[in-house]
């Protein structure tokens, strides 16, 4: 039924699963989208903590309202973690966001494990010791993104549980 609504062959995000299985996280909410792209000096020229208010990943977190799901296109990159950490995840929790879905990995896995926030990712953590955004940069907020071969628009409904993630 869902694929008939959105007009696509599949509404399942293959390869994206709960970061912390067995916690009983079960969410449904509209999407806020965040797109990452390969890093270029002009995308984030002065470092991660410069001009904090202008950074797209922070803007996306700040506009994710109660009940919404932040959906992140990181093109399956497992070398650079996106979001994560106690500050950005705590902000999501305080805003009562429904959850986080990342086609890639988050950063600060150990800190994220201490928070009871629903997260779905491609893998549990980065494949390098350096887990910040060194390969990719946040490019756009609330635009059309692609997750595991599916186009996701802001406002599309996201459903996620221990079995995985789908949209409609």
Q: Positions of the model-derived regions?
A:
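A hydrophobic, small-residue-rich beta->alpha segment in the mid-to-C-terminal subdomain
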Residues: 157-168
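Feature captures the catalytic cores and cofactor-binding loops of soluble hydro-lyases/lyases
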Residues: 1-153, 168
């Amino acid at each position: 039924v869902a694929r008939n609504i959105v007009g696509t062959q599949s509404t399942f995000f293959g390869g994206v699963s709960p970061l912390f299985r067995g916690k009983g996280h079960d969410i449904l909410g509209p999407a806020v989208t965040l797109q990452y792209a390969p890093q270029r000096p002009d995308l984030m020229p002065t470092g991660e903590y410069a001009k904090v208010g202008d950074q797209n990943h922070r803007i996306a977190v700040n506009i994710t309202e109660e009940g919404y799901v932040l959906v992140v296109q990181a093109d399956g990159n497992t070398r650079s973690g996106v979001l994560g950490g106690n500050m950005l995840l705590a902000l999501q929790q305080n805003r009562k966001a429904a959850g986080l879905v990342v086609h890639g990995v988050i950063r600060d896995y150990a800190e994220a494990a201490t928070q009871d926030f629903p997260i779905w990712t491609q893998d549990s953590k980065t494949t390098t010791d350096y887990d910040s955004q060194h390969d990719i940069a946040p490019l756009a907020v609330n635009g059309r993104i692609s997750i595991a071969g599916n186009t996701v628009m802001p406002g599309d409904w996201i459903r996620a549980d221990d079995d995985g993630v789908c949209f409609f």
